[in-house]
Amino acid sequence: EWYELRKGMLTASSLACALGDDHFKSRDQLILEKVENKEIPFVPNPITEWGVKYEEIATKFYESLNNVKIIEFGLIPHPNFTIFGASPDGICSNDSPNEYVGRMLEIKCPPKRKFTKTCPPHYLMQVQGQLEVCDLDHCDFFQVKIEDYENFEEYEKDLFLDDDVILPGR
């Protein structure tokens, strides 16, 4: 159903592609998909599967860290331009502290990309589009690095030094 709603609609997550800044799809391919109303189904890859696997954990972590409740909305059409829409990862509910009410959340859980203090440009376009669709002013771009361990011993090796002291930042 989500894919059906997106057909023919430009979404915030497609803005970078529409502006020619996508590593996986050309602007021409996007235009062709939208004009023909035949969006090619997204084929998951290891990076997107990783993000989907850990997005709920990252949301819970954000909620705990900021003492908020996140509500998911699915695909939201722009109130004035129905051919444009967005699917933010969540918005802080009215049950959240005042400074967080209505704050949007966009989560990324990249398995390998190195984090910087700034939002990568292609994600910034997505966030700006989401804010416009939802008529909001603030978004937390929340990047989470989650380690996946094969076994408990591997986890312990990462957590402790040889003398059983917990490493800083763990």
Model segments located where?
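Nucleic-acid nuclease catalytic cores
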Residues: L65-P88, C92-R170
